[in-house]
From Swiss-Prot:
Lineage of producing organism: Eukaryota, Metazoa, Chordata, Craniata, Vertebrata
Gene that specifies this protein: GDI1
Subcellular location(s) per record: Cytoplasm; Golgi apparatus, trans-Golgi network
GO molecular-function term, one example from the UniProt record: GTPase activator activity
Protein name per UniProt: Rab GDP dissociation inhibitor alpha
Consequence of changing K89A: Strongly reduces dissociation of RAB3A from the membrane
Protein source organism: Bos taurus
Length: 447
């Protein structure tokens, strides 16, 4: 332990493990420690099921009807991967795909007027969908064609829209789209949590809708992927990568002190020994004095013995409840996976409802989601504070990650990773020099 390292990483959450992997691949000497005896930090998957009951202080433990405890891997933070998104690119860049198996999530649904509807995944589905009327569909189709053809480097595709200045509200107006379609587009396709985006320049939204449709085009049923055995596999995959490139891992290792000299990090003290470093990466729990609270998220893990109604018996799906439908500022999300992903006992389903907390009664806020899931065998309620670093780490060289937000995908996490990388390395993280030229997370075989 008494050694010099380029980088010390504290905590084995996904953000920390990806950065540790990338730094190791780039030739840095990395020491990675976690005070917990397991990988994943906030983003771990809990197994066996008995462990989840203990974690939530349910002392009676799981009933026999839950099957074998070790058949369960329950994510604490529910998220899916966008098939064409940044995390999949990072998995390919680092070849971590070889340690993981993915399944396509079977469907994406959106809530409207108390019911759920499938988010159309083909033009035929869009034309047959009950989400909108006939004339609305034609206008929506025109809008989608505009988005598909839009190229920020080719003004001929702009159709009078200025990507840097025209607001998204004005683009919707240009295509004469109604409120329901705007809700659906902004929240189920562009995946915004609130409506703040409406008055921002439209380029970001157009690119988000493009990401959705490109991800969808990849595997057909939905734009989302999910790893077998749960999301806890992701940090472990990147940890293996770091180890292959010479990274040193220590779990169950308490951190006594972060040692600073002249306002700059020089090492970490653990169990009486000091490891020295030039830079430090950590999650907020290791540096409470360097973070501020930026809100709260409620996540309710629900165990079910049935698929969710009106999802065509899907064994995995996402449901988005746009904020306007339930008089809120932020959307409510449901991620559902099941025994088909080796995360639950045979015939069991795990549905996790989550949202950004807006009131003093967070459980009441997610009620519209829970109503869709009834009957629920068991609920586990977690309310987490969201933290963000108070500075960019340039002086202290202590780079702290942000807490995982309420979104159901990893794009915001990847933005944080790229941002930390840029601050540490002084240059942008570049996807283009990916080591592996295969372009498919399933390897060569079609799924």
């Amino acid at each position: 332990m008494d050694e010099e390292y380029d980088v010390i990483v504290l905590g084995t959450g996904l953000t920390e493990c990806i950065l540790s992997g990338i730094m190791s691949v780039n030739g840095k000497k990395v020491l990675h420690m976690d005070r917990n005896p397991y990988y994943g930090g906030e983003s771990s998957s809990i197994t066996p099921l008995e462990e989840l009951y203990k974690r939530f202080q349910l002392l009676e433990g799981p009933p026999e009807t839950m099957g074998r405890g070790r058949d369960w891997n329950v994510d604490l933070i529910p998220k899916f991967l966008m098939a064409n998104g940044q995390l999949v690119k990072m998995l390919l860049y680092t070849e971590v795909t070889r340690y993981l198996d993915f399944k396509v999530v079977e469907g994406s649904f959106v809530y409207k007027g108390g019911k759920i509807y499938k988010v159309p995944s083909t033009e035929t589905e869009a034309l047959a969908s009950n989400l909108m009327g006939m004339f609305e569909k034609r206008r929506f189709r025109k809008f989608l064609v505009f988005v598909a053809n839009f190229d920020e480097n080719d003004p001929k595709t702009f159709e009078g829209v200025d990507p840097q200045n025209t607001s998204m509200r004005d683009v919707y107006r240009k295509f004469d789209l109604g409120q329901d379609v705007i809700d659906f587009t902004g929240h189920a396709l562009a995946l915004y949590r609130t409506d703040d985006y409406l008055d921002q320049p439209c380029l970001e939204t157009i690119n988000r809708i493009k990401l959705y449709s490109e991800s969808l085009a990849r595997y057909g049923k939905s734009p989302y992927l999910y790893p077998l055995y749960g999301l806890g596999e992701l940090p472990q995959g990147f940890a293996r990568l770091s180890a292959i490139y010479g990274g040193t891992y220590m779990l169950n290792k308490p951190v006594d002190d972060i040692i600073m000299e002249n306002g700059k990090v020089v090492g970490v003290k653990s169990e009486g020994e000091v490891a020295r470093c030039k830079q430090l990466i950590c999650d907020p729990s290791y540096v409470p004095d360097r973070v501020r609270k930026a809100g709260q998220v409620i996540r309710i893990i629900c165990i079910l013995s049935h698929p969710i109604k009106n999802t065509n018996d899907a064994n995995s799906c996402q449901i988005i409840i746009p904020q306007n439908q339930v008089n809120r500022k932020s959307d409510i999300y449901v991620c559902m996976i099941s025994y088909a992903h080796n995360v639950a006992a045979q015939g069991k389903y795990i549905a996790i409802a989550s949202t950004t907390v807006e009131t003093t009664d967070p459980e009441k806020e997610v009620e519209p989601a829970l109503e869709l899931l009834e009957p629920i065998d068991q609920k586990f309620v977690a309310i987490s504070d969201l933290y963000e670093p108070i500075d960019d780490g340039s002086e202290s060289q202590v780079f702290c990650s942000c807490s995982y937000d309420a979104t159901t995908h990893f794009e915001t996490t990847c933005n944080d990773i790229k941002d930390i990388y840029k601050r540490m390395a002084g240059s942008a993280f570049d996807f283009e020099n990916m080591k592996r030229k295969q372009n498919d997370v399933f390897g060569e075989a079609d799924q």
